[in-house]
């Protein structure tokens, strides 16, 4: 679903494994009997993940062997909404579910690596930190980061090479976090 062709396509086996190891962490959005979006998650032990990691590391190269039911972080590994159904607040509803799940499971926070897909437009002028600050100040619109900031997430760290093929983000991602305050 990304314009740069870096779509992540999930195999039936991967989805089945995620459902088997953590069914409540996998959700779909259905409109008129059609799946139009999904959110996939695992639980990780933050002490093992740390601030600097890649998508491949946190997902065990998409084997999900990093899932730890006794961990303390709900880690989002994917969210997508079919382009024809964007703007209907469906992603926001999935994030509300994740927040409720985090609270129910008494986890410390929700975290994930968030792309900054409009950064390529500014990369020759400003560094990622400045870009993030300008998005926070609403001087720059970034479809991913703007949404996450409006959904109570904060940037914990800028990570390099999180998604090595993400040219739009210039190989950067924001480690985003929403704390469970309950």
Describe every region a protein language model picked out.
Residues 39-78, 96, 116-143, 149, ...:
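Conserved acyl-donor/pantetheine-binding loop and adjacent beta-alpha core of acyl/acetyltransferases
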Residues 16, 99, 144-145:
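Short amphipathic alpha-helical segments and helix-helix/interface helices
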Residues 24, 170-175:
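Short hydrophobic/aromatic beta-strand or adjacent loop that forms the aromatic wall/cage
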Residues 81, 87-103, 109-112:
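Conserved acetyl-CoA-binding loop-helix of GNAT-fold acetyltransferases
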Residues 178-180:
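Long, compositionally biased interface segments
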Residues 2-48, 53, 57-65:
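Active-site rim helix/loop that mediates acceptor-substrate recognition in acyltransferases
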